[in-house]
Amino acid sequence: MNRAGILLEKEPGLKTIFQGSEHSYVRCVIADMADPERHFVCRVLDEEDLPVAVGEPITLEVIKVVTERRSGIVRFDCRLIKKPE
């Protein structure tokens, strides 16, 4: 499954444990292309920073969906789909 949208914010240089090993990631929020009022919170794994500026389109491959029980917030663990040069 892919998520495409406009990058609203990003927080680079973070670290997490994912599937038993440490990974760098970028926390970001994207606005859905079809419905810009819908925002998605994503962790883009294995990236120190994104080569996409805030306000530009981005496409991510979702590898895991996580729902935080207490808050009910859904977060997507993703990988960046790189554009061919």
Predicted regions and their residues:
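Structural detector for short beta-strands of small beta-barrel domains
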Residues: 1-22
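Broad gene-expression machinery/nucleic-acid interaction feature
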Residues: 2, 25-27, 57
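Well-ordered beta-strand positions in beta-sheet-rich domains
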Residues: 2-4, 39-41, 77
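Short beta-strand micro-motifs in enzyme catalytic cores
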Residues: 24-29, 72-76
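Beta-strand/loop nucleic-acid-binding surfaces
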Residues: 29-52
